[in-house]
Amino acid sequence: MGFLSAEEKGLVNGLWSKVNVDEVGGEALGRLLVVYPWTQRFFQSFGDLSSADAIMSNAKVKAHGKKVLNSFSDGLKNIDDLKGAFAKLSELHCDKLHVDPENFRLLGNVLVCVLAHHFGHEFNPQVQAAFQKVVAGVAKALAHRYH
């Protein structure tokens, strides 16, 4: 049995099918960089990150956020094997980029906030609980190489 029930998978997939990856990805990554400014050190090549407005309107932040959420979408297609789905990204972030694995958990929590903002009442407590499990599972899978 996987970490999500069939009902939870249905809730996650149902909401995710409505997500605008371009918009939500850029907003989630932008919020991560604003709320947790120490994460900006991994994105110094992105140009102006001097203020919340600069970050949220930064084209490179938006593009990378889209890339992150496209990877997240691919992972959802392999929800019962997140470790396998994210193995290469775990290796990249650990061995080459040296990203603190705690940042994966932070980004997951920011993503949940952004989804709640975008979907309002549709993002009810059951949907949130399912997504919290998913983002925790993705963070764990991305951190796997670190252990």
UniProtKB/Swiss-Prot annotation:
Residue list for modification N6-succinyllysine: K18, K60
MF (Gene Ontology): haptoglobin binding; heme binding; hemoglobin alpha binding; metal ion binding; organic acid binding; oxygen binding; oxygen carrier activity; peroxidase activity
Asymmetric dimethylarginine modified-residue sites: R105
Keywords carried by this UniProt record: Heme, Iron, Metal-binding, Methylation, Oxygen transport, Phosphoprotein, Transport
Example GO BP: hydrogen peroxide catabolic process
Family matches, as PROSITE patterns: GLOBIN
Gene3D superfamilies: Globins (1.10.490.10)
Span of domain Globin: 3-147
Residues annotated as binding heme b: H64, H93
Expressed in which tissues: Red blood cells.
A matching Pfam family: Globin
Cellular component per GO, a single term: hemoglobin complex
Disulfide bond positions: none
Record PTM Phosphoserine, positions in chain: S45, S51
Family: Belongs to the globin family.
Subunit structure, as described in the record: Heterotetramer of two alpha chains and two beta chains.
Functional note: Involved in oxygen transport from the lung to the various peripheral tissues.
Additional free-text comment from the UniProt record: In the cat family (felidae), the oxygen affinity of hemoglobin depends little or not at all on the association with diphosphoglycerate (DPG).
PANTHER family the UniProt entry points to: HEMOGLOBIN FAMILY MEMBER (PTHR11442), HEMOGLOBIN SUBUNIT BETA (PTHR11442:SF42)
Name used for this protein in its record: Hemoglobin subunit beta-2
Source organism of this protein record: Panthera onca
Record gene name: HBB2
